[in-house]
């Protein structure tokens, strides 16, 4: 239902979801897949105690949380997931190394980079930021603008946009 954030380099993102700009931390974002009913992802809602008891009975998790001197509860489960995900970094591609000055790109890689940044393909106009996934684009004046939800749901009465899912306006009520 919502654009899923990548796991790698997640700590570098300014926005975790285009659907709700109020979510600014991963620990808050984790509530969505765990506890939301629409869309249903992990299906925890209504089963919180049962699932928590499974964690507590599992010897592996008991040992890990004891090492951290943390009780097993939902807040600490979310905190440990956050710490793990924020540790995932992937800045070792040839392009990343080229930007650091530690790699010389091949002619083929240079052609690909030039095409990506070209005006004719305009890939970089939408795929920007450190992870090429910021919800931004360059306007006609080459200034960065952020995407936003237009709220154009069912305007042509052909149900091209689902009426039940109004994205950001569902959160902001605007």
What are these regions (language model features)?
Residues 1-174:
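Periplasmic c-type cytochrome electron-transfer domains
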């Amino acid at each position: 239902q919502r654009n899923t954030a990548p796991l790698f380099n997640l700590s570098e993102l300014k926005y975790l979801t285009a659907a709700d700009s109020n979510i600014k931390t991963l620990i808050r974002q984790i509530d969505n897949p765990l506890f939301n009913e629409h869309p249903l992802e992990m299906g925890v809602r209504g089963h919180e105690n049962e699932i928590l008891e499974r964690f507590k009975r599992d010897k592996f998790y008991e040992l890990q949380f004891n090492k951290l001197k943390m009780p097993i509860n939902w807040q600490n489960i979310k905190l440990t997931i956050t710490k793990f995900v924020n540790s995932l970094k992937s800045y070792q591609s040839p392009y990343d190394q080229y930007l650091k000055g530690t790699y010389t790109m091949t002619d083929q890689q240079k052609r690909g980079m030039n095409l990506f940044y070209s005006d004719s393909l305009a890939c970089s106009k939408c795929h920007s930021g450190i992870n090429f996934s910021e919800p931004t684009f360059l306007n006609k004046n080459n200034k960065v603008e952020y995407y936003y939800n237009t709220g154009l749901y069912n305007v042509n009465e052909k149900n091209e946009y689902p009426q039940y899912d109004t994205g950001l306006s569902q959160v902001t009520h605007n």
